[in-house]
UniProtKB/Swiss-Prot annotation:
Gene: pstB
Assigned keywords, A-Z: ATP-binding, Cell membrane, Membrane, Nucleotide-binding, Phosphate transport, Translocase, Transport
Subcellular location: Cell membrane
GO molecular function: ATP binding; ATP hydrolysis activity; ATPase-coupled phosphate ion transmembrane transporter activity
Enzyme class: translocase
Start and end residues of each ABC transporter domain: 7-248
Protein known as: Phosphate import ATP-binding protein PstB
Example of a GO cellular component annotation carried by this entry: plasma membrane
Biological process (GO), any one: phosphate ion transmembrane transport
Organism encoding this protein: Carboxydothermus hydrogenoformans (strain ATCC BAA-161 / DSM 6008 / Z-2901)
Binding site for ATP: 39-46
Residue spans crossing the bilayer: none
Length: 253
């Protein structure tokens, strides 16, 4: 249904100087689904992910054409509030990157930046966010100890909690488990399945099995182009394009 489309991308082109990194991308991202972006290194999937919260704005020489509609509003229109966009679209990066602060201060950081000073409200947000990231029970007795003392998997869940603290509508994840061991990876994957009940999730992954396990839809990128996008089971069992089949069966990439 049209009303279920959270993000509508149309005719998106992105250039780094004279180099075209994304070529005429059009796709829909649906509410409360996990959309996986797959493809070999350098195919444009992470670049595309960063267009969804305008992170590419920070790179000198970037030029973007086309439109990205978030709930029907073009996020690239003139005078669009980028700060508000990044409040609605949280991001989790490849390697866990906790701030050199306590567990509590990591999660409370963004609400404070946005002007929240009430200690009781901050306490509520910290607990709610840590529970949302399935981390509360593991850290509730060490909230004021350095976040760097957590394991890698715990640090990544802390980064997810930090993203949840501003109550976003969309979560972008750029290979969130690539630096983690198998058990920590499994916990993050289970968490993603839980999170999609409340959030729309877009995840970049190099792991074909992971994309098959956790996503509802999969988009295959190659050389800056969107080759095809469909329900994940279709992409992995009956892809329309030979290049998609060659990639997911390991013939290249």
């Amino acid at each position: 249904m049209l009303s279920d489309v959270k993000i509508k991308v149309r005719d998106l082109n992105l250039y780094y100087g004279n180099f075209q990194a994304l070529k005429n991308i059009s796709l829909d991202i649906y509410k409360n689904e996990v959309t996986a972006l797959i493809g070999p290194s350098g195919c444009g999937k992470s670049t595309f992910l960063r267009t969804l919260n305008r992170m590419n704005d920070l790179i000198p020489g970037v030029r973007i054409e086309g439109s990205i509609l978030f709930d029907g509003v073009d996020i690239y229109k003139e005078n669009f509030d980028v700060v508000e966009l990044r409040k609605r679209v949280g991001m989790v990066f490849q390697s866990p990157n906790p701030f050199p602060k306590s567990v509590y201060e990591n999660v409370a950081y963004a609400p404070k930046i946005h002007g929240l000073k009430d200690k009781r409200k901050l306490d509520e947000i910290v607990e709610k966010s840590l529970r949302g990231a399935a981390l509360w029970d593991e850290v509730k007795d060490r909230l004021h100890k350095p976040a760097t003392g957590l394991s890698g998997g715990q640090q990544q869940r802390l980064c997810i909690a930090r993203a949840l603290a501003i109550e976003p509508e969309v979560l972008l994840m750029d290979e969130p488990t690539s630096a983690l061991d198998p058990i920590s990876t499994m916990r993050i994957e289970e968490l993603i399945q839980e999170l999609k009940k409340k959030y729309t999730i877009v995840i970049v992954t190099h792991n074909m099995q992971q994309a098959a396990r956790i996503s509802d839809r999969t988009a295959f990128f190659l050389n800056g182009e969107l080759i095809e996008m469909d329900r994940t089971e279709v992409i992995f069992t009956k892809p329309r394009d030979r290049r998609t089949e060659d990639y997911i069966t390991g013939r290249f990439g």
